[in-house]
Design a protein with these regions (language model features):
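Short coil/turn connectors at secondary-structure junctions
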Residues: 7-9, 25, 43-46, 58-61
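Buried hydrophobic packing segments
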Residues: 48-55, 65-68, 95, 99, ...
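Conserved post-catalytic alpha-helical subdomain immediately downstream of the catalytic base
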Residues: 52-90
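Short glycine/threonine-rich catalytic loop with a Thr-x-Gly-x-Asp
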Residues: 34-51, 61
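Charged C-terminal helix
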Residues: 74-114
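N-terminal loops that bind phosphate or other acidic moieties
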Residues: 19-33, 58, 82-86, 113-114
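Conserved phosphate-donor
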Residues: 1-38
């Protein structure tokens, strides 16, 4: 992430088991999310859309990336809690529901940012 951010003079946002955000000067790791998210088509697209939405609200793309991936990860965790005995279709819909219901307190309580 640091190399990409430095080479292209941008903020790099990389998703995975641990999400990484870097602007070449700062680095953050997000430990939210659930493995089930990798089994559903569209979670990457959702993450991109949410990142764009947060980017539109600030000049600090590093903070926008942190906010976006933390929100998406928490939504995935909540969705899994609600649908762990159901299929991936229910899980995908629950992610959408969870992201639309997130509030500041939930993000502050559940966010795992290093």
């Amino acid at each position: 992430a640091n190399l990409v951010a430095k080479k292209f003079n941008c903020t790099a946002v990389i998703t995975g088991k641990v999400d990484i955000i870097s602007d070449s000067k700062r680095l953050a790791k997000i430990f939210n999310g659930h493995p089930q998210m990798s089994k559903v088509t569209g979670t990457g697209c959702m993450s991109s859309a949410i990142t764009g939405a947060f980017a539109a609200t600030t000049n600090d793309m590093f903070l926008a990336g942190i906010a976006a991936l933390t929100s998406m990860g928490i939504a995935g965790e909540i969705a899994y809690e609600k649908t762990q005995n159901l299929g991936t279709g229910s899980f995908r819909n629950a992610i959408i529901d969870s992201i639309s219901c997130l509030d500041t307190n939930t993000i502050l309580e559940r966010g795992k940012i290093e």
